[in-house]
Amino acid sequence: MPYLITDDVSSKPDHRSLDVPWQSVGAKCVVTLAAKLMLAVLPPQTSFFKLQVRDDKLGEQFSPEIRSELDLSFSKMERMIMDYIAASNDRVAIHQALKHLIVGGNALIHMSKDGLKTFPLNRFVVNRDGNGNVLEIVTKELISRKVLDVELPEPQPNRVVDETGSEKDDVEIYTCIKLDKSTGRWIWYQEAFDKVIPNTRSTAPKNASPWLVLRFNTCDGEDYGRGRVEEFLGDLKSLDGLSQSLIEGAAAASKVVFLVSPSSTT
C-alpha cells in the first residue's frame, strides 16, 4: 500500500524513492484485516464501553431505585458519546492507524479538541526506556504559512525547492513531547526554524496523555514495534518477485514488430 508511507517531499533531492509492489494481494489482505479490527474496536450501532459505578464506592445506603436511575443516566451518556464519535472523523483516523499498525507496526494518535489525528511512521520518532515506557516523542508536520499567526523567516534563495513549490508555502513544524520526571507530567511545545513558537506549550498528567504511541508487536529493547506483515514477509517477497517476472515476461511476449512485405510496392 504505497499511500501509507509516501516519499518525503521535504527531504534531500538524492532521496531514494520507495519501491512500488507488482501485486495487490498484500494490500487486499491489509484492508480486510483492518476492517475486521475496526469492527472489533468500534462496532457500529453498539457501545464498545460501559459506564458504571463500583459497588464498593456506592455502599449500601443507596436504594435500588437510585441505582436504576444511575444506570439510566449512564446509558444516556454512552449514547451521547457514541453519537459524538459517529459525527466526528475518529473512525477514519482509527482505521488509518490500524493499517499502519498492520503494515509498519507503529502509529501515533493525537487526541485534540478537534478530534483524532494519525501520524504515520515517517512523521514521528519515539524514545522508550527499558520497560517500553515512552520518554520522548518528536513529530513533523508541513503547515502553510497562512495558517500560522507568527512571523517566520522567508526561505533562503539558495534553498532546494521541490517541484510543487511547497517549500515557499509550507513550514516544517516540529512538536516535541517529553515526560518531566520531576513533576510527573507530559510537556510539549512546537518549534519552527529552530525556535519555539509562542503559545504552543501545553501539559498533561502522566496517565492522561493525549499522545498515544501504538505498537502492533512489541520487541524487547526496541523503541518501535513490528507489524503483522513482517510475519509473512517471505511469502510477500516471493509473490512480488513472481508477479514482476510474469508481468515483464508477458510484456516481452506481446511485443509487436511491423515488417515490410516483400511483395508490396512500397
Which residues fall in each region the model found?
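Generic detector of intrinsically disordered, low-complexity, polar/charged segments
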Residues: 23, 56, 101-102, 129, ...
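Extended, charged amphipathic alpha-helical segments
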Residues: 187-266
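Compositionally biased, low-structure terminal segments
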Residues: 4, 49-50, 63, 175, ...
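Structural beta-strand/beta-sheet cores of well-ordered domains, especially the beta-sheet scaffolds
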Residues: 105-107, 122, 172-175, 235-237, ...
